[in-house]
Amino acid sequence: MKLSFIASPVWALALAQFAAATQVKIDVDVAIFGGGSAGIHAAIQLRDAGATVAVIEKKSQIGGHAETYTDPQGKSTNVGVVVFDNIEVASNYFARLNVSIVRGSPLGTAGPTYTYDFTSGAQIPAVNTSAEAQQQLTAALQSYSTNVLSKYPWIDEGFLVPDPVPEELTIPFGELAQKYNFTALMPTIAMYNYFTGDLSTIPSLYGIKGLGQGALKNLFGSFILPASGKTRDLYDAAAIELGNSVLLNADVVKVQRDVRINSTTTGVTVLIQQPGQPPKLIRARKLLVAAPPTLENVGAFDLTAEERGLISKFSSLGCWASVANVPGLNVTLKNYGVHMPYNQPSIPGPYGFVAYGSPNNFLVTVGLPDAANTAAKGEAVVRQSLATLSAVGAVPADALEKLTFPFSAVHSPYSLRVSAEEIKAGFYSKFLALEGARNTYWTGAVWAGHNSALIWNFNMGTVLPGLKKDLGL
């Protein structure tokens, strides 16, 4: 049979009519694109308000970066999201899903810790904990709180950048640290926010976002952790709650907005395909985009020129998280960038090999300069680091030969950001003005930072009030 015959107009029309006839139609109030932290939290809140939802998730499970690996002996570790800010929106959410919590610090490791520059192999002496160093840190904390955080009380609510944009939010964060004399705090910020990019050069808006009021309080106090130690518990509970409202392994084929979904209502249609199933056409009154807004992710959308222009401004880093099995290694090794500002691990590079109590298994997270080929690049970086450490005797000589990865996860694109020039030109005000336009709302880490509690804050304070109002809830 000739392909030209199948491709004729008559056959094309027949095939289109057949595809439409076999579609499964789903009518809901809100279609949610992305089943990570932002999308699942919003889904629960909307259901509680009486709305129907359909969560569209491309992976085989919900939860985004919240991954938990359990070894054959039953020892678990979180590979991605580890803790939650100890604020009301987080404790309320855990309570809503009946997931027990504890409060504490996750910064300890199992067994002794040694520090090396993973690039050169140089071993680093213990951190200075003298009284003078502590005084410098205390003074830096006070200055940061008084001169920076007090001026930007909205920082934990989202990128609610005012217009006009304060000039100091666009200068390099290292310059802001010098201006207000909180340089002694910068290594702590680097530790809490590894893989930010060069902390000395990123726009100050992003540096401040990484250590807002809530995080600062928790860093020197306590965080929320699931009582079981498994961050997956939150999403396992949510999955039970949402049931068949979650559509997994779903590829979005086409999204149309401002279209007639019935005789009286204008809304959105989302055509998805799942393996081994007929296509599904979701007809919704509103669309909530909770996945990273990259041109790749929203390629099936009917984007306006304005939306496409704004989304194209984003750049991102890459992040690869894994459990590495290194036989013979029984200590934690932390990466210390000798030649990096504030001694951040250089990118590309791992944060370290962090022991968590499972013999020979280590949590290893790698930062990359971009999101392309994350898994292959991440593994290569770990192997290069082990080769360097092996050469100086920090790990067994055969570590590289015996290295395996029983678990890994791609967390790219990571940390979507725009340039200082775009911030100055009002990028965030322009994008926030699109909330609700064309029956579409936007949420996620790109608006709140890679911090689940702050994402939920953004949902509760900015996204859900407008969305519920539009739905008449």
UniProtKB/Swiss-Prot annotation:
GO MF term set: oxidoreductase activity
GO BP field: terpenoid biosynthetic process
Residue positions with a glycan: N98, N128, N181, N262, N330
Keyword Glycoprotein: yes
Gene3D superfamilies: 1.10.405.20, 3.30.70.1990, FAD/NAD(P)-binding domain (3.50.50.60)
Classification via SUPFAM superfamilies: FAD/NAD(P)-binding domain
Top-level taxon of origin: Eukaryota
Entry EC no(s): 1.21.-.-
Biotechnology: Diterpenoid pyrones display various biological activities and higginsianin A shows anti-HIV activity.
UniProt enzyme class: oxidoreductase
Keywords, in A-Z order: FAD, Flavoprotein, Glycoprotein, Oxidoreductase, Signal
Cofactor(s) needed: FAD
InterPro entries found in the cross-reference section: FAD/NAD-bd_sf
Pfam family, one: NAD_binding_8
Pathway in which this enzyme or protein is active: Secondary metabolite biosynthesis; terpenoid biosynthesis
Signal peptide: 1-21
Keyword Oxidoreductase: yes
Function: FAD-dependent oxidoreductase; part of the gene cluster that mediates the biosynthesis of the diterpenoid pyrones higginsianins A and B. The first step of the pathway is the synthesis of the alpha-pyrone moiety by the polyketide synthase dpchA via condensation of one acetyl-CoA starter unit with 3 malonyl-CoA units and 2 methylations. The alpha-pyrone is then combined with geranylgeranyl pyrophosphate (GGPP) formed by the GGPP synthase dpchD through the action of the prenyltransferase dpchC to yield a linear alpha-pyrone diterpenoid.
Family under the similarity heading: Belongs to the beta-cyclopiazonate dehydrogenase family.
Protein name: FAD-dependent oxidoreductase dpchF
Organism: Colletotrichum higginsianum (strain IMI 349063)
